[in-house]
Amino acid sequence: LGAEIDCTGLDPASKQGDRRVHGALAAIRKGNATIPGRDIPDLIPALAVVAAGTPGTTRFTDIGRLRLKESDRIATTLALIEALGGSGVAGPDSLEIYGKDRLPGGVCDSCGDHRIAMSAAIASLRCTGPVTLRGAQAVEKSYPAFWQAFASLGGQIAWEEEA
């Protein structure tokens, strides 16, 4: 983990938003990117934590509907990043992340949202210290074996169950 990742099998002609992940990741790596999120709302939490661990400023625009998901994903994504030592600013329809090379780590909360929990795992890869996640069981909604897969790849994250 922590190596360069290549996403294969994504059809560039597909109507699925996932096809845009290559361009978004390339823009984040270049630094100072603006990424329209209207067609890729489910990717924003993961892309935002990648941006938090990459030097430069990344602005996600047209993402207001993220406030109406399992959690207010604009607010919970920023809270996750801030809990791990990153920074940014949330707007009504946007999220701006001020990336740096590494995050220190810390204790964060999934807020019961599977995408926030999985994004915490991604963020942990750019942390110099340990990460503890509250509500890790949120991944059960979409990928029950997520933590086993993450650990099998060498990922390390501690978790606390929600009360």
Task: Put a short name on every predicted segment.
Residues L1-A163:
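Short, structured segments at the rim of ligand-binding sites
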